[in-house]
Amino acid sequence: MDGTSNNCIMANVTEFENASDIKRLKFIVDALKESIPADGIVLDVGCGNGIISRGLGAQGFNVYGIDVSDKAIAKARQMNTYPNVRFDVINAEQLVADGKTYDGVVCSEVLEHLTDPSALLKVLYQSLKPEGRLIVTVPNGRGPRELFITKPTIALQKRNNWLWRAFKGLKSAMGYKGTTVQSDADDLTHLHFFTRKMLKKLAGESKFRIVRFGKTNFVENVFPFSLFAKRIKVLQKWDCQLAELLPIGFTGGFVSVWEKNKQ
């Protein structure tokens, strides 16, 4: 069965609608199926509204989704219909104090928002079983969206002048709510812009090594291409396929599998 067929199957069992999100979830599912036992437990860190946790639950995984946001967990619980998926409001310190270890840990689109990503990774190292796998996904800090959308937007926001107010008004008029399909957090600002080299360095400093790198999309979520891709779904699929043909530096996001460094 080819990747396109697998993505179509995945689309039928997830709340994600965007092709790159479905591709990201498929990477996570495949990586976990290859590395953890059938009755293993997966920790979803920074789970937000729980969309990934529920996607994993639909695949039969036992999932424990955690977030520091009461609002996020309340929504995650409200939307959850899977008996094998549960959610709690827990911070890193509580996770360590709990002392439990997990067969797999998912940290998807989280590290770029943290002041100190290495602090969380140290906690995840303690929370992962010796032969477990950590799945990390982050935007490519030098990818099209970060270069042409995220960084200019942050620079404009810092100026906080009439141009920023006009920009916010335009986004609002176009239906942009300032949230993502994965999170309704009040602040989704990117504090870090990871390159592949930076991510590998961060992994090493946290006593992990990256055993697999993958790509997400190219420009389907970059204005003005996003206007067309949002309405014409096949453009999203083509964009994800194009990302596979281009050098990894051109991808919009990195998907990766980490394991504990045995050296």
Locate predicted features.
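Active-site hotspot residues in diverse enzymes, especially metal/ion-binding acidic/histidine motifs
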Residues: M1-N7
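S-adenosyl-L-methionine-dependent methyltransferase catalytic module, highlighting the catalytic core
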Residues: C8, N12-I22, I51, V68, ...
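Conserved SAM-binding loop
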Residues: L25-F148, F254-K260
